[in-house]
């Protein structure tokens, strides 16, 4: 029983630390060729935010991407004038890699 209590306490401690520490995401204003060219950094997601990557493609060619903490992030795909925009969301530290 003591071993189980210790395991439970350790597990709860990790969950608490995750909440206190917050979700950390990569930020980049402009990524070209999967390399951050401007605004590289990190953000800590606030309530209702997730890590996000929005990538823009023309045909099969990646044009550029942005990376950020995004409020009420939704995965979506849209196309306008031949430019495809794809938004991906994730909830693990630094999951929005470039």
UniProtKB/Swiss-Prot annotation:
- Give the signal peptide range: 1-22
Lineage top rank: taxon: Eukaryota
What processes in GO biological process is this protein linked to? regulation of neurotransmitter receptor activity
One of the record's GO cellular component terms: extracellular space
Give the UniProt keywords, A-Z. Answer: Cytoplasmic vesicle, Disulfide bond, Secreted, Signal
What is the name listed in the Swiss-Prot or TrEMBL entry for this protein?
Prostate and testis expressed protein 4
Compartment(s) where it occurs, according to its Swiss-Prot or TrEMBL record: Secreted; Cytoplasmic vesicle, Secretory vesicle, Acrosome
What task does this protein carry out? May modulate the function of nicotinic acetylcholine receptors. May enhance sperm motility.
Which Pfam families does UniProt cross-reference here?
UPAR_LY6
GO MF entries: acetylcholine receptor regulator activity
Q: Which family does it belong to?
A: Belongs to the PATE family.
Q: Where is the UPAR/Ly6 domain?
A: 23-98
Q: State the organism's lineage.
A: Eukaryota, Metazoa, Chordata, Craniata, Vertebrata
What gene is behind this protein? PATE4
Cysteine pairs forming cystine bridges in this chain are: 25-51, 28-36, 43-69, 73-89
Checking CDD domains in the record gives: TFP_LU_ECD_PATE4
According to the record, the segments passing through the membrane are none
């Amino acid at each position: 029983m003591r071993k189980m209590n210790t395991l439970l306490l350790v597990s709860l401690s990790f969950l608490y630390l995750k909440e206190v520490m917050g979700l950390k995401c990569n930020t980049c204003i402009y990524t070209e060729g999967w390399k951050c060219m401007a605004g590289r950094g990190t953000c800590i997601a606030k309530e209702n935010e997730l890590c996000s990557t929005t990538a823009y493609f023309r045909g099969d060619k990646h044009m550029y991407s942005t990376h950020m903490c995004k409020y009420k992030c939704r995965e979506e795909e849209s196309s306008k004038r031949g430019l495809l925009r794809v938004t991906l969301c994730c909830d693990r530290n630094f999951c929005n890699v470039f």
